[in-house]
């Protein structure tokens, strides 16, 4: 479980303020909000890239507030995926294992294991510049998951995908999460992604979480009103399905 208490992070004139937030083990937690409200600042604080002025971040009762990124066992997939263009797919996925000094046999085995789960074994020898947007996303996901993180952070993971690939990727990542059961924190400004993927939605406004609710509850709030045209077609579907119960 991740527990955040009395947290303040300053970045220029911007302040991220979190009085109390709990994210459960194995949860798919979606952070929703428009641009500029602090969603990426929140992820970078969890990763240890930004240092709080005050407050605590705990994981299973252990205070990790001042731990360096490499000690936290968190993995981040940035919006642009940040793949290494001079490496093939195998070496991109293996990068985090190599810098940990692990054996070649171990690296080869676990890279092929995660590539099989993500259905990308057939592209391991290709250069990343030759990949489609959906393939790049899966490579970035494989590179993050191969180090077996306790928490996976996703920053607008579908931003560069067309609507068809976006829908396909939603289903794929949800299926992988259900299989591997890591804790996921997914940042987006897209309410459809939030409703269809989240166990719970945390809505951010001006650097604060103003509500944390289950998707079926969130769509009834004032914070969902700006997205009304997008969510109306989903309302009946959610009402009559077991999705996100």
What are these regions, as identified by a protein language model?
Residues 105-123, 174-175:
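Conserved ABC ATPase "signature" region
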Residues 127-131, 135:
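Conserved ABC ATPase signature
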Residues 146-150:
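A short, proline-enriched helix->beta-strand linker immediately N-terminal to the Walker B motif
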């Amino acid at each position: 479980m991740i527990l955040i208490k009395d947290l303040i992070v300053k970045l220029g004139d911007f302040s991220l303020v979190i009085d109390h937030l709990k994210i459960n083990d194995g949860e798919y937690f979606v952070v929703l909000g428009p641009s500029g409200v602090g969603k990426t600042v929140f992820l970078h604080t969890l990763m240890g890239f930004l240092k709080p002025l005050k407050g605590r971040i705990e994981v299973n009762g252990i205070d990790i507030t001042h731990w360096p990124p490499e000690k936290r066992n968190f993995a981040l997939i940035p919006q642009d995926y940040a793949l290494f263009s001079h490496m093939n797919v195998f070496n991109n996925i293996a990068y985090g294992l190599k810098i940990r000094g692990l054996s070649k046999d171990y690296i080869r085995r676990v890279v092929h294991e995660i590539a099989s789960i993500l259905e990308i074994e057939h592209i391991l020898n290709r250069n990343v510049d030759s990949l489609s947007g959906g393939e790049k996303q899966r490579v970035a996901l494989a590179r993050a998951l191969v180090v077996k993180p306790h928490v996976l952070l996703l920053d607008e993971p579908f931003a560069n995908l067309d609507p068809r690939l976006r829908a396909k990727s939603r289903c794929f990542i949800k299926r992988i999460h259900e299989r591997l059961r890591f804790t996921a924190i997914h940042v987006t400004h897209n309410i459809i992604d939030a409703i269809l993927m989240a166990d719970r939605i945390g809505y951010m406004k001006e650097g604060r979480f103003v509500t944390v609710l289950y998707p079926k509850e969130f769509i009834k709030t004032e914070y969902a009103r700006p997205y009304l045209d997008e969510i109306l077609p989903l309302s009946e579907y959610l009402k009559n399905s077991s999705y996100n119960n």
